[in-house]
Structure formats: C-alpha cells, structure tokens
C-alpha cells in the first residue's frame, strides 16, 4: 500500500456486499490476517499484541467509507507520544484509553466529522479513543467496536448495530462500504 509513503500491512478488512459480510470472522492470531480476501475479517486485541511483539509496528491507520453517508474517516496515528499511546492501547500493551486530539493525522481524503471533532470522542465527550462501559469486550474488540466515536452521532463500529457504522449512526449500508485497519 502506497498511502502516506507505503509499507502498510492490512490487519482488518470488512467490505459490505460480500456474502455474509455481517458475520464477522474474528482473527485471534495475526497469522489469520491472510484471510483478508473474505472481506469480513476483524482482529482481536490479543492478535494485535502478538503482531506487535513480532513486527514492532509504530503506526496504525484507520480507514472507512460508507457511501450513503458520503464521508470518509481516514486517519493515521501521529509520529509522537500521543500516537504511540494509541498504538500501545490497540495492541493491548496498556488499558489506558489514549487521548484522541493530537494523536492522529488526517489523510487527504478524510472529510469525517469524527476526525474534525476529536475533543467530543467517548462518553461525556472525554476526548479519548475507544469505549468505556459495562458489557463491552474491551480485551477483544478494541479495533472494531467503537474505536472512535461521538455519543449518539458518529461512530466507527462493527458490533452494536447490524448496519455497521462509519462516521454515522445507523445509516443504511451500500455494497462496497468498507472498514480497514493497517499497521506499519
């Protein structure tokens, strides 16, 4: 992948329109990411930790687009301590939810509300990545269950509602909508 200088490894890939795309295939070892062509592959936090141990990646890139919404969320963790905190969190090396503002760089095609309004992320506009709350499987689902979200408005979510969310809340899906995560 040549985005932002290249070197990206695809670790999560969900594309609507493929058969049974809403029946996600959870990879509990990073070795399962070779199944990316199924277009319904998500990766667990423990698999990210395993991958980090072997690859020591320094950045994570989040990219989703939902055609009915007309917006794209496309950010890369920043090459600074705030961006590193995001990498550490999504790799399961810490349980401290990282601050969102200053932790990422918006890519050229990003026109999302989420990326524009980082101080409003999480419950109570805490301005943090991820999701807190009871009943949430934070040890498994960090990358695909509310990785970034503004309560009741704009979400990155492949768990809570059947119409997966990308910078929206419950908008209708279209064939070709996608959610991808890369590391390098």
Positions of predicted regions on the chain:
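Mature extracellular or lumenal effector domains of secreted proteins
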Residues: 1-184
């Amino acid at each position: 992948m040549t985005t932002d200088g290249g070197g990206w490894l695809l670790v999560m890939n969900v594309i609507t329109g493929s058969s049974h795309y809403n029946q996600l295939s959870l990879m509990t070892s990073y070795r399962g990411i070779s199944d990316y062509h199924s277009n319904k592959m998500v990766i667990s936090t423990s698999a990210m930790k395993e991958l980090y141990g072997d690859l020591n990646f320094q950045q994570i890139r989040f990219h989703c687009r939902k055609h009915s919404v007309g917006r794209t969320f496309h950010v890369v963790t920043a090459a600074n301590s705030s961006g590193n905190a995001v990498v550490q969190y999504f790799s399961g090396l810490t349980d401290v939810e990282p601050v969102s503002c200053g932790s990422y760089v918006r890519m050229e095609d990003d026109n999302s509300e989420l990326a524009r309004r980082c101080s409003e992320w999480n419950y109570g506009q805490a301005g943090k990545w991820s999701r807190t709350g009871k009943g949430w499987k934070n040890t498994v689902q960090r990358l695909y269950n509310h990785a970034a979200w503004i309560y009741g408005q704009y979400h990155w979510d492949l768990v809570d509602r059947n119409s997966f969310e990308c910078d929206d809340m419950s908008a209708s899906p279209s064939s070709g909508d996608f959610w991808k995560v890369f590391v390098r």
